[in-house]
Amino acid sequence: MNNRLQPAPCIELDGAQGEGGGQILRTALTLSMLTGTPFRIERIRAGRSKPGLMRQHLTAVQAAAEVSGATVEGAEAGSQALAFAPGPIHGGDYRFAIGTAGSCTLVLQTVLPALWFADAPSTVAVSGGTHNRAAPPVDFLIRAWQPLLARMGVTQTLALKRHGFYPAGGGEVLATVTPCAGRLGALHLTERGALRELSGQGIVANVRPGVARRELEALAARVPGVVGSVRELSPAEGPGNALVLDAVHEHVTEVFTGFGERGVPAEQVAHGVASAALRYLHSTAAVDEYLADQLVLPMALAGAGCFTAVTASPHLTTNIAVIEKFLPVHITVQAERDASVVRVQVN
């Protein structure tokens, strides 16, 4: 995908722009690898309570550097400035350890799009957190994100080998990727189709199963039609608790997740999941805000496509701004006549 006949000019980024989080860095790493364009970013996560690079961000940088043979400056804990100059993307067998409960999914979402266009198949194992309230859980990637990528021509599988909850981590995810034969196909996702299933799962590891049962009962009371089940993991994978709701529609599956914490009632966890799900179900949008965040980059790589979403989050608009610095695309976000829906178009 990249063109290295002439040295590409370095792109300058402000890590505090827009939403100001780690997504700016991750998107820049992905697109830098894919386009062969070096970048420099200042003020990384400057507005956060702990600014600069944290362990999961460092792991994403190190993973991108290994996949692309990049030259990197500033890859240190707490650093608020980073320079990244990529080389060619190489497929292979990779293993990355975050060392904390930092998100495996965010590291994977940094390097996987590059490996879609590598010179050989790849496997990527990442250890760390798999169920973390600050990032999409692995369930979301497997059941919401991955099927839509497959429709665009991506051949990729994700397997959850071991759960990793905050704060201990210790989880592992394995991804396998076969490079794409050509450019990604455009995805047009403006309707979600008929509702087929509402499936709730209460996951517990070294936590009483009664907690999951209470969560599911409270969820079913708020969201009619939910069919729930309790999943007990090995105590060694805990302590941890997650409540996961899949809204399976004809054209898309959305995944909503809440996480149990010490001192937080099970009913409160269920209330959060139910509120997010009902906002989506009561709209006519094809996707919720978090899936919208994750779709815009592959759509930009395809060069075309559109989807409707519940809202245009600050994450989404900031991501769009970074994408447009690296790729010759124009991405518009417009409110539909239905005030609960926005339309995102890639041209």
Swiss-Prot record:
InterPro entries, sorted: RNA3'-term_phos_cycl_insert (IPR013791), RNA3'_phos_cyclase_dom (IPR023797), RNA3'_phos_cyclase_dom_sf (IPR037136), RNA3'_term_phos_cyc (IPR000228), RNA3'_term_phos_cyc_type_1 (IPR017770), RNA3'_term_phos_cycl-like_CS (IPR020719), RNA3'P_cycl/enolpyr_Trfase_a/b (IPR013792), RPTC_insert (IPR036553)
Keyword Plastid tagged: no
Keywords on record: ATP-binding, Cytoplasm, Ligase, Nucleotide-binding
GO molecular function: ATP binding; RNA-3'-phosphate cyclase activity
Binding-site residues for ATP, renumbered to this chain: Q109, Y290, L291, A292, D293, Q294
Top-level enzyme category: ligase
Keyword Disulfide bond: no
GO biological process, one term: RNA processing
Residues annotated as catalytic: H315 (tele-amp-histidine intermediate)
SUPFAM superfamilies reported in the protein's UniProt record: EPT/RTPC-like (SSF55205), RNA 3'-terminal phosphate cyclase, RPTC, insert domain (SSF52913)
Known function: Catalyzes the conversion of 3'-phosphate to a 2',3'-cyclic phosphodiester at the end of RNA. The mechanism of action of the enzyme occurs in 3 steps: (A) adenylation of the enzyme by ATP; (B) transfer of adenylate to an RNA-N3'P to produce RNA-N3'PP5'A; (C) and attack of the adjacent 2'-hydroxyl on the 3'-phosphorus in the diester linkage to produce the cyclic end product. The biological role of this enzyme is unknown but it is likely to function in some aspects of cellular RNA processing.
Protein name per the record: RNA 3'-terminal phosphate cyclase
